[in-house]
């Protein structure tokens, strides 16, 4: 939807009706200059794919996705990958019970220091792929 919108520095999507959306993959991919993004009003109850949703949002420093209903999501690969200036993500409330792919979910988030709700990201028996999930997260202590 906003894939490769390199010139956006802020984006207000609080009024978007996302109640029937099943695929949010690549939604904000490559929004390299995006610094402010408010997705707190997103209804994600039907979403199954969040892969690369915020990938390469290189100037995003903080993201609050606490309101995301992730109970139906199966793919979270690269979700926050290559967000090199991302310092804080709040995933409190995440339900990863159906997720089968979390590969490179936080790959290359070299400035990530705070991952609130990380206890909700569980490696359950059904997760087939967690390869390089936190690769390059040099400052993160979980």
Report each predicted region and the residues it spans:
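Negatively charged
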Residues: 1-142
């Amino acid at each position: 939807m906003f894939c490769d919108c390199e010139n956006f520095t802020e984006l207000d999507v609080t009024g978007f009706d996302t109640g029937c959306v099943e695929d949010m993959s690549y939604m904000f991919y490559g929004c390299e200059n995006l610094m402010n993004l408010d997705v707190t009003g997103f209804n994600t109850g039907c979403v199954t794919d969040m892969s690369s949703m915020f990938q390469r949002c290189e100037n995003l420093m903080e993201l609050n996705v606490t309101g995301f209903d992730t109970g139906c999501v199966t793919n979270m690969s690269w979700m926050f990958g290559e967000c090199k200036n991302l310092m804080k993500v709040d995933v409190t409330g995440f339900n990863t019970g159906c997720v089968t792919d979390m590969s490179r979910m936080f790959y290359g988030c070299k400035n990530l220091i705070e991952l609130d709700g990380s206890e909700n990201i569980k490696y359950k028996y059904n997760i087939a792929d967690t390869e390089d999930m936190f690769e390059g997260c040099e400052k993160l202590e979980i």
